[in-house]
C-alpha cells in the first residue's frame, strides 16, 4: 500500500498527471487524482501495452479513435500514458493537456512501474481496491 501511495503521490505532484489508475490481474488497485468512479475495463490500447510490454503514449487523445477506453478514468482526458506491469497489469496516467508529458516523465513512470510490478509479484503490495485520494 505504501508503494502505491508514494508512487501515485509523486506522479500527481511532480508531473503533469491529473489522474492515476493501477490495474493488476484485472482488478483496479488504485484510483487517485481527478477520476470518475465508472468501472474501468482495459480496452485495445491497454491490452496492447500489456501484451507488448511497452509504454504507449497518447500525446493528444483527440487524434486517437480508441480514446473512449479511458473515459472511465475521466471524460475526455487530453493525454494518456499506459505503462505495463508485465502482461498482468498497467499503470495508466492521464494528463492535464495535450503533449503535457515529457520524456523524463515517461521514464520516471516506467521506473516506478518496474518497482511496483516487482512488489506486486512478490506480494509486498496487497491488492485491495482503493478509492481516489
Placement of each model-derived feature along the sequence:
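Short acidic, glycine/proline-enriched loop segments that cap or flank alpha-helices
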Residues: 4, 69, 99-100
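Juxtadomain coupling helices with adjacent low-complexity linkers
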Residues: 91-133
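Regulatory sensory and allosteric helical modules in signal-transduction proteins
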Residues: 24-78
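Short amphipathic alpha-helical segments
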Residues: 3, 7, 41, 104-108, ...
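Glycine-rich, often proline-containing surface loops adjacent to acidic residues and nearby aromatics
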Residues: 25, 87-91
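Short hydrophobic beta-strand micro-motif common in sensory/regulatory domains
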Residues: 76-86
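Intrinsically disordered, low-complexity terminal regulatory regions
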Residues: 1-30, 122, 126-127, 131-133
